[in-house]
């Protein structure tokens, strides 16, 4: 990633997967289970956080092109990208299932997802461990463009080409439609306190207090 940051010949970078029906399915669950030391867990998380932050800070637009399952770390690196595009195929799923393992997204997803779609809908995704259809993710503003699968690669390249003169995706483009209730809760201290109290209770319930 550091080497990419020094490239002056790149106008944009498209992140894709060569695997059929899988973008990135996240971390190795068995590898996570072997970590029993808190310091080791924190360092492992920080190591990937540094990588994703470096990706996020590249001096040109990055586009995550999702054409299959993008969960856990797959969504987290997508959130660190400037834009996210996804195939309209029915089996495409996007989400953060970590809560089902008794943990929370540790590579920046808990911060970047609320920035993109708002606190309330982000908490709903994180605390339910939901994997959303691409069309739902697009409707929430999580995905910037929904592309027909038959021409996905061509259209993703076109999308990237159109973004070569921009550095950041404007906030107004990133935010999906939110209800008056969500806006009211997010924009005042009492509302945020209510949201986080509810989030804490849901997290305890989802992990059975573990």
Show which residues each predicted segment covers.
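Intrinsically disordered, low-complexity segments enriched in small/flexible residues
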Residues: 1, 6, 121-123, 133, ...
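A structural preference for short, pocket-lining loop segments at secondary-structure junctions
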Residues: 1-39, 50-67, 87-92
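Phosphate-coordinating loops and pocket residues in cytosolic domains that bind phosphorylated ligands
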Residues: 25, 34, 127, 139, ...
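Glycine-rich phosphate-binding loop at the start of an alpha helix
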Residues: 26, 45, 49, 72, ...
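Short, structured coil segments at secondary-structure junctions
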Residues: 25, 58, 80-81, 141-142
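CoA-thioester-processing core
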Residues: 51, 71-126, 140, 156
């Amino acid at each position: 990633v550091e080497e990419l940051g020094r490239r002056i010949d790149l106008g944009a970078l498209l992140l894709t997967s060569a695997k059929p029906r899988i973008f990135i399915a996240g971390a190795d669950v068995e590898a996570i289970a072997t970590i029993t030391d808190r310091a080791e867990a924190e360092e492992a998380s920080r190591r990937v956080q540094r990588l994703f932050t470096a990706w996020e800070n590249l001096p040109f637009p990055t586009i995550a092109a999702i054409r299959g399952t993008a969960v856990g770390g797959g969504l987290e690196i997508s959130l660190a990208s400037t834009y996210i595009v996804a195939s309209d195929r029915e089996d495409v799923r996007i989400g953060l299932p970590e809560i089902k393992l008794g943990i929370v997204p540790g590579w920046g997803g808990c911060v970047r997802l609320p920035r993109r779609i708002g606190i309330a809908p982000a908490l709903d995704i994180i605390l339910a461990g939901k994997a959303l259809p691409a069309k739902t993710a697009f409707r929430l503003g999580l995905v910037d463009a929904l592309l027909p699968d038959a021409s996905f690669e061509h259209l993703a390249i076109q999308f990237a080409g159109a973004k070569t003169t921009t550095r950041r995706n404007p906030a107004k483009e990133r935010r999906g439609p939110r209800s008056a209730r969500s806006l009211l809760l997010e924009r005042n201290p009492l509302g945020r306190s209510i949201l986080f109290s509810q989030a804490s209770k849901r997290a305890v319930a989802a992990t059975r207090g573990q």
